[in-house]
Amino acid sequence: MLVLGIETTCDETAAAVIERAPDGIGKILSNIVRSQVDEHAPFGGVVPEIAARAHVDLLDGIIDRAMREAGIGFAQLNGVAAAAGPGLIGGVIVGLTTAKAIALVHDTPLVAVNHLEAHALTPRLTDGIEFPYCLFLASGGHTQIVAVTGVGQYVRLGTTVDDAIGEAFDKVAKMLGLPYPGGPQVERAAAGGDAARFAFPRPMQGRPDANFSLSGLKTAVRNEASRIAEITPQDISDLCASFQAAVLEATADRLNVGLRLFREQFGAPRALVAAGGVAANQAIRGALHDVARQAKTQLIMPPPALCTDNGAMIAWAGAERLALGMTDTMEAQPRARWLLDANATAPAGYGKTRAGF
């Protein structure tokens, strides 16, 4: 089975072709990603209008390159998959509309993929893992712990009640004057800092649920930074190191609870799986190794290039769905918000969370 995947939910324009064998083994034939960092850097963050226009300008060429690198023509495709949300609606419209056009012209099945499901299923492409497994999904817009029990079968065990982890990293970078994109800059600065200098809180630590909260920690960083009369590069490194250490410790605590909840509902997970752009952070990857070791479970993390947004994960999610006969019509709609767990509700006492609703 050959599937073209298209990703345009944020600031990466991407397309890929994957091959899925009858036994479920996947192979990436091409995976082209064009980052829009340069376009958004002057503004210190992603500008939705600029992102959408860039997708319009870039996508046709990216798809053409992906097809040529894979060495196939459109007539050979068994399906076309596009991320239909959640994401910036302008970009989602561009990608889904393009996929519909290709599917219509070439009489090829269409799959409208949930971007979060694509992250959730990537470890099955890279490592061939069987269900069920416990997913830690962390990105600029989402932070969730999810039980993955099958294609289209997800139970959210925990979520953020305010900022996503990636969002918190970006906001801390911005308040400290670090360039965009902020996450890698904070990680880089933290490497030369003293993580013990600032005693930041460990949000939600010790709670019986598996939810996250980052807004208070972000405020604590701002307060400490404002107390420094003339902030130096070393001060920034120390602030970043202390912030990152707090995130790592809080994340480990939340994951320990999430794994306990998983075992209570589904038995022992086959693995703890990390996905999403934040999982490319080397310090977080190290912390996840510690959590998995203590939990006596396998840790699976796709290569960093497949943790951040890419077309291969969309193509693979499309292939997984096609293998089960799951396709979509031309009436498939783009969505700015799209729950991975359709039955999930907002954590008690918090109303609607910002990430995931």
UniProtKB/Swiss-Prot annotation:
UniProt record similarity statement: Belongs to the KAE1 / TsaD family.
Keywords: Acyltransferase, Cytoplasm, Iron, Metal-binding, Transferase, tRNA processing
Transferase among keywords: yes
Organism: Bradyrhizobium diazoefficiens (strain JCM 10833 / BCRC 13528 / IAM 13628 / NBRC 14792 / USDA 110)
Record GO biological process: tRNA threonylcarbamoyladenosine modification
Cofactor(s), names only, from the UniProt record: Fe(2+)
Pfam families: TsaD
Subcellular location(s) of the protein: Cytoplasm
Top EC class of this enzyme: transferase
Record text on cofactor binding: Binds 1 Fe(2+) ion per subunit.
Lineage: Bacteria, Pseudomonadati, Pseudomonadota, Alphaproteobacteria, Hyphomicrobiales
Enzyme Commission number(s) of this protein: 2.3.1.234
Annotated GO CC locations: cytoplasm
SUPFAM superfamilies for the chain: Actin-like ATPase domain
Domain of life: Bacteria
Binding residues for substrate: L137, A138, S139, G140, G141, D170, G183, N281
NCBIfam families: gcp_kae1, T6A_TsaD_YgjD
Gene3D superfamilies on file: 3.30.420.40
UniProt protein name: tRNA N6-adenosine threonylcarbamoyltransferase
Molecular function GO terms recorded: iron ion binding; N(6)-L-threonylcarbamoyladenine synthase activity
Described purpose of this protein according to its UniProt entry: Required for the formation of a threonylcarbamoyl group on adenosine at position 37 (t(6)A37) in tRNAs that read codons beginning with adenine. Is involved in the transfer of the threonylcarbamoyl moiety of threonylcarbamoyl-AMP (TC-AMP) to the N6 group of A37, together with TsaE and TsaB. TsaD likely plays a direct catalytic role in this reaction.
